[in-house]
Amino acid sequence: MANTTSAKKATRKIARRTAVNKARRSRVRGFIRKVEEAIATGDLAVATEALKAAQPEIQRAATRGVLHGNTASRKVSRLAQRVKALSA
C-alpha cells in the first residue's frame, strides 16, 4: 500500500496508463485477427486490405510503447509474408 502522497498519485497514474495500454493492445489484436482470418479464408484482396489497416496500428502501438519496436516489426513482417504467400 502506498504511504506517501506521491506514491498514491503514481498508483493512480499507473492504473490509468494500464487501462489505456490494454485498450490499445486489444485494438491491435483485433486488427491482427482480421488479417489472420482473411488469410485463413484464402481471400487475397481482403487480406491485403486488412494488412494495410493493421500495419499502421501495430506501428503506432510500438511508437506509444505498448509493443516493443522489434516485436511490432516482426508481426508486420510475418503477416506480410503470409499475405504474399496467398498470391503465389
From Swiss-Prot:
GO biological process: translation
Domain of life, source organism: Bacteria
GO molecular-function terms, A-Z: small ribosomal subunit rRNA binding; structural constituent of ribosome
GO CC aspect terms: cytosol; small ribosomal subunit
Region feature Disordered, mapped onto this chain: 1-21
SUPFAM superfamilies xref list: Ribosomal protein S20 (SSF46992)
Pfam families the record matches: Ribosomal_S20p
InterPro entries in the record: Ribosomal_bS20, Ribosomal_bS20_sf
Keyword tags: Ribonucleoprotein, Ribosomal protein, RNA-binding, rRNA-binding
The family this protein is said to belong to: Belongs to the bacterial ribosomal protein bS20 family.
Role of this protein: Binds directly to 16S ribosomal RNA.
Protein name: Small ribosomal subunit protein bS20
